[in-house]
Each structure stands twice: as structure tokens, then as C-alpha cells.
Amino acid sequence: MEAFTVVEAVVAPLDRPNVDTDAIIPKQFLKTIERKGLGKHLFDAWRYLERDGKQVNNPDFVLNQPAYAGAQILLARENFGCGSSREHAPWALADYGFRAVIAPSFADIFANNCVQNGILLVRLPMDVVDHLFHEVAANPGYRLRIDLPAQEVQTMGDSRYAFPMDAGHKHKLMHGLDDIQLTLQRDNAIRVYEARRRQTAPWLFRD
């Protein structure tokens, strides 16, 4: 998993509240257990149109507009990621290329899944998010700098906004660790514990 320290990138605005995981990645794409390849289906129902039996880009959708090509930061509204707990949602966001999502609030399960997949969720107050939407609308191709070690978002005008972050989640993201990799960092301690347990409770082990 790629570590997250500082990212400066184009911001794509998605000005809709309560975007659920079915909107992020529709159910027909959930058959795969591969994390790669889902980016092309991100926001599928909004991103594409059906014309003459063919799927074509919706020119009105933000991800199809040239100003937001290569965006790595998604600006969203409150309760982003609500709905079912499908992990395919952060898989699709990550595969598209998003490193961070900024919003006033996120659904809890979605938020945890994002941490496990290296996506930083930045919670900012509603008035700050409103201001950022205004700035992005006025300046297509608008960029933000997100500094995770400092827990700070910096704008093109040099305004700075601090954001809260769970210490454990911050450690995982900064070092590119999921739960399994975090556990493996304690491999020696686990082996010592298992050896001790083998001596004190041998019936628990089958050689």
C-alpha cells in the first residue's frame, strides 16, 4: 500500500450530499475480488450515458471534464460513503487515482475501509467545505496541498485548515500499512509468545 505523506493535486468537486457506496461503485461490478480494474466503473451511473445501445461519457459529469483530468483529491459533501459496507467503494476510488477525499463527514464503515486501502479522509467544517467548492468552481483545475504529518490542508491562496486524525490511522497511512502488515511488524513478539504458550499449554498446538 502506498504511503501518504504530502499530496498536492487537482481537486475534483462532487457537489452532492449523502453519496452512497452504490453510487460510488454499482452492485453489478461487485463480483470481482480484485482491487484493480474498478476505477473505470467509479460513479458509473453518473459518469456514463447510454446512446444507441452504447455507453458514452456524460460530458456534464466532473470526472469527464478536462479541467479535472488527473485529479487525486475528491471534494465531497456530508455523509459521503453511506449505505452498504462494500470495500469495492474505496477500491474503485483508489484505482481511479484518488489519494484523498475531503468532506464534512463520512460513514463509519466506509471510513475504516478507506484507511485499509490507503485513502486519506479529511474532515473539514461545513463552512470551509463550502468555501472550497466556491474556489474550485471559480478556478477549474484548482489544486490543494494535503500535509498528513502536519494534519493540514493548504490552498492556492495559502489559507491553511487543520483537520483531526486518529493517531492509529495516521500511522497506518503514513507508513502504507494495513492491519495485516501492522501485525507482521510484531512478528518476533508473536513468535516468542507462541513458543511460551507451547510450553505452558501444549494441548493447544498440533504438530
UniProtKB/Swiss-Prot annotation:
SUPFAM superfamilies: LeuD/IlvD-like (SSF52016). It catalyses: (2R,3S)-3-isopropylmalate = (2S)-2-isopropylmalate. InterPro entries: 3-IsopropMal_deHydase_ssu, Aconitase/3IPM_dehydase_swvl, AconitaseA/IPMdHydase_ssu_swvl, IPMI_Swivel, LeuD. Heterodimer of LeuC and LeuD. It comes from the Bacteria. GO terms for molecular function: 3-isopropylmalate dehydratase activity. It is an enzyme of class 4 (lyase). This is 3-isopropylmalate dehydratase small subunit.
